[in-house]
């Protein structure tokens, strides 16, 4: 997957705006500023990447919470999760025969910092910035009194499928070796972000909105934040969430309040959201300049972005089976799920012989956009070794390619058809 027109437009617009803004701040021409960047001398400081940006933009306005606790609060037993240290990947086999949504106890967890223990009674959400007419603050109770919505949406780690880059390029990447279990679908209840932004009276010149979490520090490298464009923040399915699957939002998943940026990579859906900055300028964080960026020969850098910024999730499929599974011979129902960050799924084709033949899978309702669809095929298994493959196409016509995207340093957004080895005895 090379850089799409949409990704390129997003990158070029943000880059151009940031260059103009930084040049004006430093009192120099755009040409002189670009020359400074090209020289490398003082480039980080010129761009505001020297560690002071987050501290300058942030204020100590967090609600009271205890000292950092563990990386995880809920039990994460090995029979349900693959341990990646600071992340817990859902084992796909646990979804066999289960409901459409993933229960809270089975939902994957990816944290950048330990879980803050926040007292819901003391929680405050602050909306501020130079692009709002007034600063506003909400308690949890005040948020819950606003008109709420419940949406079924996926949250998916941008690194989901990373291990298959290693398979494809014969080169292991740093970080958690995610298979395909870095995704979950839940019913999320909350308030459209638009509603709280409207209370703050967003100015006409607003450009970027940046939710900030309470789990990190206040310096640039430790600020748990990810900017999004104003139009994405105002979308109907961008929420400030306080409920998950009919329960209060659990601590592991961002409780008491998190952001949900539907369809985008998981790091955009900031957990433990404590404030939202609205700016007339381009906002940057470590999660759209160093992480959350595809870096490699096929992803041209344009400072401050060293590559292509990850936004929308792509199309993927997974079998509800362990990798390298062993099955008995006889009649089988082979099942799985497929999903897309932009749409719902139109069709899924399945091969049980390594791609020699394909057959359409039966899709099972519901089939919700930006979530997933369940599917299955019948199979009479005889002893031997097999390679299962699944290839989904969404309603926008996006189809999983045979291979994943060009190599990128962090291993983001793998979407290729995955080989799933199976042995029948």
Region locations from a protein language model:
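N-terminal export signals
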Residues: 26, 32-55
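Intrinsic disorder/low-complexity signal
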Residues: 15-16, 49, 59, 69
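Basic/polar N-terminal segments that are highly enriched at the extreme N-terminus
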Residues: 1-10, 46, 53-62, 425
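Intrinsically disordered, low-complexity sequence elements enriched in Ser/Thr/Gly/Pro
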Residues: 20, 28-30, 50, 89, ...
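N-terminal secretory signal peptides
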Residues: 1-32
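Structured, non-membrane catalytic/scaffold regions adjacent to prosthetic-group chemistry
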Residues: 59-425
């Amino acid at each position: 997957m090379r850089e799409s027109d949409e990704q390129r437009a997003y990158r070029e617009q943000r880059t151009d705006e940031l260059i103009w803004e930084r040049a004006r701040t430093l009192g120099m021409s755009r040409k002189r500023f670009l020359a400074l960047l090209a020289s490398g001398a003082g480039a980080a400081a010129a761009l505001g990447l020297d560690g002071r940006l987050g501290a300058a933009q942030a204020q100590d306005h967090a609600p009271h919470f205890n000292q950092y606790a563990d990386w995880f609060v809920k039990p994460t037993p090995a029979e349900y999760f693959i341990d990646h240290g600071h992340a817990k990947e859902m084992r796909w086999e646990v979804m066999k025969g289960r409901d459409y949504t993933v229960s809270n106890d089975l939902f994957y967890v990816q944290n950048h910092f330990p879980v803050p223990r926040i007292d819901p009674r003391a929680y405050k959400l602050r909306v501020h910035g130079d692009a709002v007419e007034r600063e506003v603050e909400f308690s949890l109770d005040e948020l819950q009194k606003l008109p709420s919505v419940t949406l079924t949406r996926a949250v998916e780690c941008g690194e989901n499928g990373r291990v298959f880059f290693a398979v494809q390029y014969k080169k292991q990447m740093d970080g958690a070796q995610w298979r395909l279990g870095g995704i979950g679908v839940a019913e999320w209840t909350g308030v459209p972000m638009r509603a709280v932004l409207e209370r703050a009276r967003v100015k006409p010149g607003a450009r970027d909105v940046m939710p900030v979490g309470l789990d990190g520090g206040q310096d640039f490298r430790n600020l748990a934040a990810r900017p999004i464009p104003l139009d994405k923040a105002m979308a109907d399915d961008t929420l400030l969430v306080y409920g998950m699957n009919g329960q209060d939002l659990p601590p592991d998943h961002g409780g008491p309040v998190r952001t949900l940026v539907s369809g985008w990579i998981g790091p955009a859906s900031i957990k433990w959201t404590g404030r939202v900055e609205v700016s007339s300028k381009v906002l940057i964080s470590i999660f759209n300049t160093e992480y959350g960026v595809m870096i490699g020969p096929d992803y041209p850098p344009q400072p401050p972005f060293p590559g292509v910024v990850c936004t929308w999730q792509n199309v993927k499929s997974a079998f509800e089976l362990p990798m390298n599974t062993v099955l008995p011979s006889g009649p089988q129902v082979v099942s799985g799920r497929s999903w897309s960050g932009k749409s719902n799924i139109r069709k899924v084709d399945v091969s049980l012989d390594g791609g020699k033949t394909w057959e359409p899978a039966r899709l099972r309702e519901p089939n919700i956009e930006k979530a997933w669809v369940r599917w299955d095929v019948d199979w009479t298994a005889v002893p031997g070794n097999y390679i299962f493959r699944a290839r989904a196409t969404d309603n926008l016509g996006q189809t999983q390619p045979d291979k994943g995207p060009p190599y990128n340093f962090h291993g983001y957004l793998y979407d290729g058809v995955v080989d799933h080895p199976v042995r029948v005895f």
